Amino acid sequence: REGHAFDTALYPLPPWEPLKGFTLDRALVYAFMRQESAFKPNAKSVDGARGLMQLMPRTASFIGRDRGLRGHKRNQLFSPEFNVALGQKYLRHLMETDGVDRNLVKIAAAYNGGPGNLRKWMRKIKDKNDPLLFIESLPSLETRTFIRRVLGNFWIYRDRLGQPTPSLDAIAAGQWPAYTGLDANIKKAEILIKNVENR
């Protein structure tokens, strides 16, 4: 019970919900949110990243298709619901990028280091079969640390939400960890999408 109370304090279930609801599992969104801003809606980095998911105005503008987010609307990124909505949309975008394919290590690497850097690193790293070796081969210490922390956050949130951790089992077995939706509404939506794609 003591450990549970400790997890509850360090890994809270935040009160914010993205505009139009979650389209990715809460465990994944919370994992990034915890690492990026420690759940501080007004967080701002020295580079100018803003809000709970620490979105750069340029990235937010691209994902939100609103050029104003680069300029006069950039403070909207401090709105929790708006920021988390764009953040999960960006995670989905990275997930569906060529070469990433729902791979949790690569999603985290692209989120932190940028998709362009991830592509460059993937070209340079020779051994792409071992996920742990891949992480340790990344030239950016910040990105290596970010990946490890986000994955740890993700698995703890899975546990907090009473969900299994197939991606932890995968990486422990030397396989790439993939994102699979486990929240009831996400799982249902993904089944519907697969059914449509298979028609």
Model segments located where?
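Catalytic glycan-binding domains that act on GlcNAc-containing polysaccharides
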Residues: 1-199
